[in-house]
UniProtKB/Swiss-Prot annotation:
TM spans (from-to): none
InterPro entries per the UniProt record, alphabetical: Ribosomal_uL11 (IPR000911), Ribosomal_uL11_bac-typ (IPR006519), Ribosomal_uL11_C (IPR020783), Ribosomal_uL11_C_sf (IPR036769), Ribosomal_uL11_CS (IPR020785), Ribosomal_uL11_N (IPR020784), Ribosomal_uL11_N_sf (IPR036796)
GO BP terms, alphabetized: translation
One of the Pfam families matching this protein, by short name: Ribosomal_L11
Organismal lineage: Bacteria, Pseudomonadati, Pseudomonadota, Betaproteobacteria, Burkholderiales
Protein name: Large ribosomal subunit protein uL11
């Protein structure tokens, strides 16, 4: 018989830098999960990823205090900022533009994120990412 699921915990944790401090410690502690076990397992799985890159993780907590977790791809906004070497998006996206991104760059990001997106094709994913870029104040070229 399958284990009884008591809840899901969604967090964004920097790659290779999971530690028991907030937000990880309190979130896992509430469910009675072993915090250090998660930190060690997460850091081991994210060794090949660029350190500090925020990764969404979904932790499934079971009734017997065990857990499993799934690491997703980095948020689209982080990948867009990284692609155009930007520190942060525009505070007013309509009037203040902070950079430009090409369709080719968006296609690279779309191929990375496709498994975590609800888009049917790379082209649909590119259009979704273009919307995210525009909302950050980034001009999209070639779309």
């Amino acid at each position: 018989m399958a284990k009884k699921i008591v809840g899901f915990i969604k967090l964004q944790v920097p790659a290779g830098k999971a530690n028991p401090s907030p937000p990880i410690g309190p979130a896992l502690g509430q469910r009675g999960l072993n915090i250090m076990e998660f930190c060690k397992a997460f850091n081991a799985q994210t060794q090949g990823v660029e350190p500090g890159l925020p990764l969404p993780v979904v932790i499934t907590a079971f009734a017997d205090k065990s857990f499993t977790f799934v690491i997703k791809t980095p948020p689209a906004t982080v990948l867009i900022k990284k692609a155009i070497k930007l520190d942060k998006g525009s505070s007013n996206a309509l009037s203040t533009k902070v950079g430009k991104i090409t369709r080719a760059q968006l296609e690279e990001i779309a191929k990375t994120k496709l498994k975590d997106m609800n888009a049917a094709s790379v082209d649909a994913a590119v259009r979704t990412l273009a919307g995210s870029a525009r909302s950050m104040g980034v001009t999209v070229e070639g779309l």
